């Protein structure tokens, strides 16, 4: 089952088992250049107080998120203010024209961290997803909690091995992102739609294997759940690192 399809059901379950707890998310940028993280709350919930911010190379900052919550984080790169005064990014742009994304998601390709936070020390679900393509190496690590609580990441720079058909190039011709085959080729066998709309009929493709071989912990395509979804109990905090 796709991660997004779980959001509504999980939030309903969590609301019926309500307690109050907050998770601290610490963001660290180990990339050589500035990254502009974006945040998006799913399931129709209210957006976080910060929906986007600047994070200089070597810098760290934190956000507090109250459970239950489900949503995603990502990094934007190659950002600037254009001649009309609008803030734009070459990868991960959310189209708001501002550093804050204001409830808008990332334009692919973008490496995503996806989470569902439980209340009352329940079970959190989380993953790193490349279903929408790749732009930056990223890692998510729980701190505290109980159970498996394993970190997950895509630490490799897939841009260096991205197939030509999937490459997203910057103004200087360098590869700054790697599109999913679904986005680049728009075929049902890559998008897991139509006759390919089940796990049995939509196996990994040569393109998704490029992502999986580089980042075995991350979702490489829609039906990668078994190896790419992680869990943690007990209300952990989380660290998100760009270019770990």
Swiss-Prot record:
Pfam families: Thaumatin (PF00314)
UniProt KW keywords: Disulfide bond, Glycoprotein, Secreted, Signal
Segment forming the signal sequence: 1-22
One Gene Ontology term, aspect cellular component: extracellular region
Chain positions carrying an annotated carbohydrate: 150
Modification after translation: N-glycosylated.
Tissue spec: Style.
PANTHER family reported in the protein's UniProt record: OS03G0233200 PROTEIN (PTHR31048)
Full protein name: Thaumatin-like protein 1
């Amino acid at each position: 089952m796709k991660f997004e399809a779980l959001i509504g059901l999980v939030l309903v379950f969590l609301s019926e088992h309500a307690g109050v707890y907050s998770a601290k998310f610490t963001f660290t940028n180990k990339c050589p250049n500035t990254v502009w993280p974006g945040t998006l709350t799913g399931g129709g919930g209210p957006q976080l107080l910060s929906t986007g911010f600047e994070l200089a190379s070597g810098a760290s900052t934190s956000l507090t998120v109250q459970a239950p919550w489900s949503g995603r984080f990502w990094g934007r790169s190659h950002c600037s203010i254009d001649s009309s005064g609008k803030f734009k990014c070459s990868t991960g742009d959310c189209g708001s024209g501002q550093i804050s994304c204001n409830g808008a998601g990332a334009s692919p390709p973008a490496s995503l961290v996806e989470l569902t936070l439980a209340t009352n020390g329940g079970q959190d679900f989380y993953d790193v997803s490349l279903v929408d393509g790749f732009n930056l190496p990223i890692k998510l690590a729980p701190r505290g909690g109980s159970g498996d609580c394993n970190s997950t990441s895509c630490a490799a720079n897939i841009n260096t091995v991205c197939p030509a058909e999937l490459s997203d190039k910057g103004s200087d011709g360098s590869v700054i992102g790697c599109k999913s085959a679904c986005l680049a080729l728009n075929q049902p066998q890559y998008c897991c739609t139509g006759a390919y709309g089940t796990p049995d009929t939509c196996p990994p493709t040569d393109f998704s294997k490029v992502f999986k071989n580089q980042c075995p912990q991350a979702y490489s395509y829609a039906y990668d759940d078994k190896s790419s979804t992680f869990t943690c109990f007990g209300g952990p905090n989380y660290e998100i690192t760009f270019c770990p």
